[in-house]
């Protein structure tokens, strides 16, 4: 029973992800900021969909932070520094099918506080 519930939740997240990706894309000036959330950590990257390259990425494991709101704020601050070093100040936020609440919302708000326009 539990396996079916988990499978259904994953299926619904992937469906949301596909709907979102059909509507947004990033370019060199306005990259798509994609977030992946695991049980232990967060991963965030800026993607140029036109050239299909990753412009910048931050891994929560390397920073030693957990997948909670405080960790999301630290990762976002580090990611904002990386983007500013590459002269990127505006981007499109891709929540990757996750609900815009909790950790994902804290990450986006912290990016905005650090000067990245989403």
From Swiss-Prot:
A GO BP annotation: translation
Gene3D superfamilies: 3.30.420.100
Record's function text: This is one of the proteins that bind and probably mediate the attachment of the 5S RNA into the large ribosomal subunit, where it forms part of the central protuberance.
Quaternary organization: Part of the 50S ribosomal subunit; part of the 5S rRNA/L5/L18/L25 subcomplex. Contacts the 5S and 23S rRNAs.
Originating species: Campylobacter jejuni subsp. jejuni serotype O:23/36 (strain 81-176)
Protein family: Belongs to the universal ribosomal protein uL18 family.
UniProt keyword list: Ribonucleoprotein, Ribosomal protein, RNA-binding, rRNA-binding
The keyword Zinc belongs to this UniProt entry's keyword annotation: no
Domain of life of the organism encoding this protein: Bacteria
Protein name in UniProt: Large ribosomal subunit protein uL18
SUPFAM superfamilies in the cross-refs: Translational machinery components
GO MF, one example: structural constituent of ribosome
GO CC aspect terms: cytosolic large ribosomal subunit
């Amino acid at each position: 029973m539990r396996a079916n519930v988990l499978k259904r939740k994953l299926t619904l997240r992937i469906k949301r992800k596909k709907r979102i990706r059909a509507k947004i894309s990033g370019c060199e000036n306005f990259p798509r900021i994609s977030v992946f959330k695991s049980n232990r950590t967060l991963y965030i990257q800026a993607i140029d969909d036109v050239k299909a390259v990753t412009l910048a990425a931050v891994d929560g494991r390397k920073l030693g932070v957990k997948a909670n709101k405080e960790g999301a704020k630290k990762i976002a601050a580090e990611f904002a520094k990386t983007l500013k070093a590459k002269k990127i100040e505006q981007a499109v936020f891709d929540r990757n099918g996750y609900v815009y609440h909790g950790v994902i919302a804290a990450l986006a708000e912290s990016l905005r506080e650090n000067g990245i326009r989403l």
